[in-house]
Amino acid sequence: MAPKKKATTAAQKDRSKALDLAMAQIEKDFGKGAIMRLGDENRPPISAIPSGNIAINVALGIGGFPRGRVVEIYGPESSGKTTVALHAIAEAQKGGGIAAFIDAEHALDPEYAKALGVDTDALLVSQPDTGEQALEIADMLVRSGAIDMVVIDSVAALTPKAEIDGEMGDSHVGLQARLMSQALRKMTSALYQTGTTAIFINQLREKIGVMFGSPETTTGGKALKFYASVRCDIRRIQALKDGQDVVGNRTRLKIVKNKVSPPFKIAEFDILYGEGISREGSILDLGVDAGIIKKSGSWFTYEGEQLGQGKEKARDFLKSNPELAEQLDDRIMQELKVGPYAKAKDEPIADEDQPIDVVPNFDDQDVEPQN
């Protein structure tokens, strides 16, 4: 038995030596760090850009949208997709970062963006003519390494040049899907290397002839579903009224895919017309759920201090006391162990084997039916 064991040990040494030589050659040809053992480098946890709302930060699991990754936000019309993206831009700017907005829909309202806290003077905006131009501009900005976030609004509006130059009614099967696939292949590596977050806003379509399950699908083919580290499904669930007037929407955001934290978490929050997402409303909701804010009848109380009777008055009180709102935000994040307060968890993080969609038929086809 001894000679066999020695032979095995010698073979292992030869393999190890051959591997070291191969790794040395790879580093010589492609640069240091081109290949390494995963345990050799002490990687910091994935950093994030806050979303601007604590409910979304908690649902995302790491305190915001991950840096260096692709994020997709999709939902029906007027559900709050652009509002969520603009809040994220405002947070990136507050942290000293630079953000870009690729307005393929040509529908960005500067006044609304300013009301949400976006520094419109510093925001980079492009209104491209074609889908190729939009994605090329986004890629160049990412590769510059100078920006922290780029938002593309929306994938559905990224019209291929061949379609624009062609006649109305011409069939252009799969052009947009191929365009998105090529762009994401190019951008993914650059996003990771520069730590830039790319948010793609997407629209919903309905498939023809679906008998079972949801007929809903997103535009742009399958590529974005695979490349996105986070996919958010956003929907209006209730109208908010002040008397007879509708003043906003109660909105639900579901994390249907998450490669950086456990998926399928849900955030509910209020979007007020002209103001955007109510930060104070989410603080009250999560504070009560976490037991930090006490609710007795209609009164909200924090450490013996009355915040107000009814949610509206308590929200107004927190608006007029931003230091207290910030303190509560931080304490809730600490209590729920989210973001900088997250502890190392034993459970594996979802990755390539994770289901891409909650609704399986989202991935049935790469190209939308031509009407």
Curated annotation (Swiss-Prot):
Residues annotated to bind ATP: G75, P76, E77, S78, S79, G80, K81, T82
Role noted for this protein: Can catalyze the hydrolysis of ATP in the presence of single-stranded DNA, the ATP-dependent uptake of single-stranded DNA by duplex DNA, and the ATP-dependent hybridization of homologous single-stranded DNAs. It interacts with LexA causing its activation and leading to its autocatalytic cleavage.
Main location: cytoplasm
Annotated spans, Disordered: 343-371
Disulfide pairings: none
Family: Belongs to the RecA family.
GO MF annotation list: ATP binding; ATP hydrolysis activity; ATP-dependent DNA damage sensor activity; damaged DNA binding; single-stranded DNA binding
Protein name (database record): Protein RecA
One GO CC annotation: cytosol
